[in-house]
From Swiss-Prot:
InterPro entries the record matches: AAA+_ATPase (IPR003593), G_ENGA (IPR031166), GTP-bd (IPR006073), GTPase_Der (IPR016484), KH_dom-like (IPR032859), KH_dom-like_a/b (IPR015946), P-loop_NTPase (IPR027417), Small_GTP-bd (IPR005225)
SUPFAM superfamilies named among the record's database cross-references: P-loop containing nucleoside triphosphate hydrolases
Assembly: Associates with the 50S ribosomal subunit.
Binding site for GTP 1: 9-16, 56-60, 119-122
Residues annotated for GTP 2 binding in this entry: 187-194, 234-238, 299-302
Protein name: GTPase Der
Keywords, sorted A to Z: GTP-binding, Nucleotide-binding, Repeat, Ribosome biogenesis
Amino acid sequence: MKPVIALVGRPNVGKSTLFNRLTRSRDALVADMPGLTRDRHYGEGRVGERPFIAIDTGGFEPVAKEGIVAEMAKQTRQAVVEADVVIFIVDGRLGLAPQDRVIADYLRKTGRRILLAVNKAEGMKYTAVATDFYELGLGDPRAISSAHGDGVRELVDEALDLAFAERPELAEAAEGHDHGTRIAIVGRPNVGKSTLVNALIGEERVIAFDMPGTTRDAIYVDFERNGKPYTLIDTAGLRKRGKVFEAIEKFSVVKTLQSIADANVVVLLLDAQQDISDQDAHIAGFIVESGRALVIGVNKWDGLDGHARDRIKHDMERKLQFLSFANVHYISAKQRTGIGALMKSVDDAYAAAMVKLPTPKLTRVLQEAVEFQQPRRAGVSRPKLRYAHQGGSNPPIVVIHGNALSNIPETYRRFLEGRFRDAFQLKGTPLRIEFRTNKNPYAQSNE
């Protein structure tokens, strides 16, 4: 599991600038989730070898009672609940404001680990920066510059140290859960995740490990199906009640990101009785950016007539065309129809994600593709694609070496992706292609 860091402060102190700097440290998964709020954003960042989830909040005015300001305060409180560590950001140039005192009073009562960051401190002496803010009673102020990066690495390192000290299970959560293929079932509220979970595991045969804590904790459920072991990473909110498991439909961006990151295969569940929403597309975007194998389940299919079925298929083609690599299954979790075929696709997708791609065959497929269609000339020279090898798995990465590869158009990259997919039957997994211009064994002989 990844630690969660919430950025909190009054308006215009530089929270979003810090958020962008943190999540830009890798390919950020940034969620501006319609239906949740426009004022709470989630992203993934990394410092060294330590990944984390950051939450950017709107300007916090905890005493607001109504209107958009009150809604922003509500969203900030929720971010604090989800966080392991809160970074409270104040403005070093404007100094201590009455609103800072109110926010500090609120944060002290939450029981969360709090780090006080004085932003916009570039060019200022530390004593001048810190003096005003000691009275907030939140420990030593940390001087930073979100815009220039001064002090940011040290701040985040300290936040992560606190998170792991507070909750050692963050580092240990996934250990001991290699029971089988790890599956995350994700989707917006009320699409039937809990019903599908129950259909897969059955209440009486489930062996679960329920970590103490809050809604940001993941639950791992080991089960078997047709003799094969699996581990389900809960996003539907499974909670043990006696000997029975009750599934609670509750959407959490943090839990969804955590589950996708921990999974081998993600099942994206859609509601056949509703149009594809922006929220569906955002969740799908998380999955693709994370590189996870994917199977799509369209639930509640049994209650639709032919016209409605055609409508949802057309809607998917229009809004989720970037998921064309994934198998789609039309199921009824309630009636337990279509689930066997869906699980076969889960197995196939995981196998595709972990496939070994021999260099000779990769290079042969590449050469055949180039013979069929050469890339367009870019400037004075035409790109020359020499050879290919596998650069990683889960998802598979194909590294192509050659000359003048910096201007390969996206259309040609997609063409090559299709050729590799067909040759290796890669269904259900993203496929990444990297172009590298460097020395290779063929360079002198072919020039």
